[in-house]
Amino acid sequence: TPNKNLERVAQTLKGIPCLLEIVGPLSEAQENVLNENKIHFRHEVGISNARIAEKYQEADVLLFPSTYEGFGMPILEAQLTGRPVITSDYSAMREVAGDSACLVNPFSVESIRQGVLKVIQEDEYRKELVEKGTENVKRFSAHNVAKMYWALYQEMHATQH
C-alpha cells in the first residue's frame, strides 16, 4: 500500500548494498521501482506469525518509514527481537517508538537515507537504539497497558461524578 512508502525506500537504498526483505504483496509498479533502483529484494505473502518472527531474527534493522499507521506494531515486534528501528517521526510511529528509534521524515528520501546510514555505520548509536527498544517494549506489556486503561477509566469516571 502507498502508506508503506516503498518507493521512497527504494530511492533511499539505491547504492547501499543490502537485501530488502518485504512481507506483504507488491504491485507491479512497486516491483518496477525496486528493480529500477537496483534493489536486491525478496518478498513473502501470507506468512505465519512464526515466520514473521523468523524474519525479524534474520534482519539487521527494521526500516519502517510509513506515512500512516494506526499503531505501528512492527516497531515493537522488531524491538522485541533486539533489532534497531528506523521509523517515521510522524503520527503513531513517533508515539510508539519515542526515543527508542531513529526517527526520520517519511516524505524525504534524504532524511530516510541519513537515518539508514547512521544506524548501519555507527555501532554505539545502533546499540543504544537496541537497548532503548528493549525498554520501550515494556511500556506496551499487557500489565502496563491494563494499568493505563484502568487509570483512564478512573479519570473518566471521576469527571462524570
Predicted regions and their residues:
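Carbohydrate transferase catalytic cores enriched for Leloir-type hexosyltransferases
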Residues: T1-H161
